[in-house]
């Protein structure tokens, strides 16, 4: 009986065996990512692929200042509206800024033909050389060049006219046929602008040009048009019943443009030799211009980001991330972040068999925790960690490189008569945007799934590496841990970690301890059976005695009557 009690005592005594556990890193990160199967998975490390912030400023682009048109628009700037005199010397820019109240355009009412196409052309121009194409003093000796002014284009309270055009009228009582040519020798394309005046009455036609049946002809190798004044009564706009239509063309190097007219010509005074080849553009923004520099500008503000995607604004100028509709694009680089719960022990589930990470292991993603007579501690597995870091870093860089197509995306220009085309274009652009957004989100979801599976696989591989070394010299006790059947000092623990564990060296000790433990288990089973019988009999006796005592008490006070019949 004494021997059995000793064995029973052993079964309730915790024997502190040496152990080694495989685990993974955890930290206090709150980063969450989405995968194909899950949303908001907390991870230890991640990288953001989506820029969602800006500085609220309009900045220089790569050191080149933008051109702020203020209250003027492109038409007013190029024609030379007197209200835009501050822009007369502007000849270079990184991009052009119009504001929501850029209303000073054509001061004399009329239509600017193909104006949207001209604005589109400016997207590839960042500077020009402004020059006199037909000098005012010498080009028109037989015509008047000083009386062509109007209250619609007033300056300082007096009638004036566009700074880059000349309103040619009759001299005395005649308007002789004029013919003037210019040959482009600038070595680049030249932008030429002119106009045609349409008076409201025949009397005004004769008053200005003398000739009732006047015409204007403009021709080059690529452009050839003949205009006749459309004389008609019209409602007044800016005090004018007449109209002026404005035209433009690009003159190639070596090409010649000829103007011929017998009246109604608004002649070019200045032209522009264009420097093409760089990405520019026109944006509409009320943001302030600051002394700052950026590589990417949006109407809302500048982006200083190397990320492949942004959701700030679809219109961008410079080297900009691709616009997507997404609100979150975060790529996992680390592991699932599930710190172990202390009441559960060190582990809590990655890879399906380990239920929590270690915040105490800070020098690697995967590693070990050991405990023996010399103490306990964490140690990262540097090789598997470094291989994982290299692989994931390469993958992230590859994704960013493939998706990080930096470019300018300016809005397309449409006039009021092209609304159906504009609406169709918006639908097409929205379709492309939806595809881009879907592709970006799907890419991130798939890569996050692969990354987390990759980490799970690495932890499993590390576990299998330990298991294959220890074999039956230790037993699996769950949660990624092994309990040794032999004493394993720090040197022994280190050999397990670095893959040099000497199985034969410890196999004999392990065999003896394993057999002893198995014997204790068998004896314990016999003791448990005896205890079970004793417990059953004792319980029955207690119940029987209790029932008898209660019955005797009830008979003695008359609560229970007992009759014995023979």
Swiss-Prot record:
The chain crosses the membrane at residues 530-550. GO terms for biological process: clathrin-dependent endocytosis of virus by host cell; fusion of virus membrane with host endosome membrane; fusion of virus membrane with host plasma membrane; viral budding from plasma membrane; virion attachment to host cell. Pfam families: Hemagglutinin. Residues 18-529 are extracellular. Disulfide bonds join 21-481, 59-292, 72-84, 107-153, 296-320, 488-492. The record marks 344-345 as: Cleavage. Homotrimer of disulfide-linked HA1-HA2. Interacts with human CACNA1C. This is Hemagglutinin. It comes from Influenza A virus (strain A/Duck/Alberta/35/1976 H1N1).
């Amino acid at each position: 009986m004494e021997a059995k009690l000793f064995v029973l005592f052993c079964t309730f005594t915790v024997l502190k065996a040496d152990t080694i556990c495989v685990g993974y890193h955890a930290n206090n990160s709150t980063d969450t990512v989405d995968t194909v199967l899950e949303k908001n998975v907390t991870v230890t490390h991640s990288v953001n692929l989506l820029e969602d912030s800006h500085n609220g400023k309009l900045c220089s682009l790569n050191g080149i200042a933008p051109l702020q048109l203020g209250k003027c628009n492109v038409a007013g700037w190029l024609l030379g509206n007197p209200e835009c005199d501050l822009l007369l010397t502007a000849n270079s820019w990184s991009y052009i800024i119009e504001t929501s109240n850029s209303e000073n355009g054509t001061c004399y009412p009329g239509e600017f033909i193909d104006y949207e196409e001209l604005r589109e052309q400016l997207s590839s121009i960042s500077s020009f050389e402004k020059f006199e194409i037909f000098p005012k003093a010498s080009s028109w000796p037989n015509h008047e060049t000083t009386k062509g002014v109007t209250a619609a284009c007033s300056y300082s309270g007096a009638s004036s006219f566009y700074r880059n055009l000349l309103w040619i009228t009759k001299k005395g009582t005649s308007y002789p046929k004029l013919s003037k040519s210019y040959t482009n020798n600038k070595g680049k394309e030249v932008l030429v602008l002119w106009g045609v005046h349409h008076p409201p009455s025949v009397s005004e036609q004769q008053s200005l040009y003398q000739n009732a049946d006047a015409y204007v002809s403009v021709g080059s190798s690529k452009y050839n048009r003949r205009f006749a004044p459309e004389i008609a009564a019209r409602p007044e706009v800016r005090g004018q019943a007449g109209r002026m239509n404005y035209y433009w063309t690009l003159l190639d190097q070596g090409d010649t443009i000829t103007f011929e007219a017998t009246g109604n010509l608004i002649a070019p005074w200045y032209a522009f030799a264009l420097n093409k080849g760089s990405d520019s553009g026109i944006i509409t923004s009320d943001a302030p211009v600051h002394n700052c520099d950026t590589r990417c500008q949006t109407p809302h503000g500048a982006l200083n980001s190397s990320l492949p995607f942004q959701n700030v604004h679809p219109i961008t100028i410079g080297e900009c991330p691709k616009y997507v509709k997404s609100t979150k694009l975060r790529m996992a680089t680390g592991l699932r972040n599930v710190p172990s719960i202390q009441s559960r022990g060190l582990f809590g589930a990655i890879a399906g068999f380990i239920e929590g990470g270690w915040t105490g292991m800070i020098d690697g993603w995967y590693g070990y925790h050991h405990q023996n007579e010399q103490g306990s501690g964490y140690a990262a597995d540097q090789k598997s960690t470094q291989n994982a870091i290299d692989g994931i870093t390469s993958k992230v860089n590859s994704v960013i490189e493939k998706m990080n197509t930096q470019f300018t995306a300016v809005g397309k220009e449409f006039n009021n008569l092209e609304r159906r085309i504009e609406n169709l274009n918006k639908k097409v652009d929205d379709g492309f945007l939806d595809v881009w957004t879907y592709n970006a989100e799907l890419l991130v979801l798939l890569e996050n799934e692969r990354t987390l599976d990759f980490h799970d696989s690495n932890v499993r591989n590390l576990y299998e590496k330990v298991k294959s070394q220890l074999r039956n010299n230790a037993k699996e006790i769950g949660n990624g841990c092994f309990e040794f059947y032999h004493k394993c000092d720090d040197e022994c623990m280190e050999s397990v970690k670095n893959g040099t564990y000497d199985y034969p060296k410890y196999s004999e000790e392990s065999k003896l301890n394993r057999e002893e433990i198995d014997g204790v288990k068998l004896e314990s089973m016999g003791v448990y059976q005896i205890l079970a019988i004793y417990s059953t009999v004792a319980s029955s006796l207690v119940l029987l005695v209790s029932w008898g005592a209660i019955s005797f008490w009830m008979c003695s006070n008359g609560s229970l009557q007992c009759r014995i019949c023979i």
